[in-house]
Amino acid sequence: MAREIVVAGAGVFGLACAWELLRRGQPVRVVDSARIGAGASGGHVGALAPHAPETWNAKKQVQLEALVAADGWWADVAEAGGTDPGYARTGRIQPVPAGAEARMAERIAGARAHWPGWAEMALTTTPDTPLVPVSDSGLWLVDRLTARISPRRACAALAAAIRARGGEIAEGVTTEGPAIWATGVAGLGPFGGNGV
């Protein structure tokens, strides 16, 4: 059997790393000096929004691929652990400032060139959503790619999936040995630079 990999940090990033390792057959142990979701992952809402599609680059492509894969990935997490992560692909509506129409046209052209067709970005004068922000121009930019997640529920769902798959999560514990460090800014302090 493969040697266990330690992941330091039980926020969304650390737990997601551990879950992906387990999915690939690698035993893992997650440690957190406090508790699951103690840092930024203990927040109320997370937006999973795509980078602006104009001036495309490799970083934007990697992020797009992750957003496209998110539906299935979070569904697998929910199924494995029996806990809803609070993920939904909700789309996004943004008011367009007066005079920004040409810039929005560039953005829409970039989305058409790089995003999957179902993700559609478009301008509208009649948004179909119950909450519509004020738009001085009378235009809104909408997309179907943006998603949202509950960080707290995501952590709970990932922890449940990890435990269901045989992974260990130890709270109130640190590690001195080699690990995947996913401890956020607070965990960087011992490495110097005041976490910067």
Protein language model regions, located:
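Short beta-strand/turn micro-motifs composed of small residues
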Residues: 9, 32, 97
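Flavin-dependent oxidoreductases
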Residues: 16, 61, 177-196
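Glycine-rich FAD pyrophosphate-binding loop
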Residues: 23-42
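Helical element adjacent to the flavin cofactor pocket in flavoenzyme catalytic cores
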Residues: 140-178, 182-187
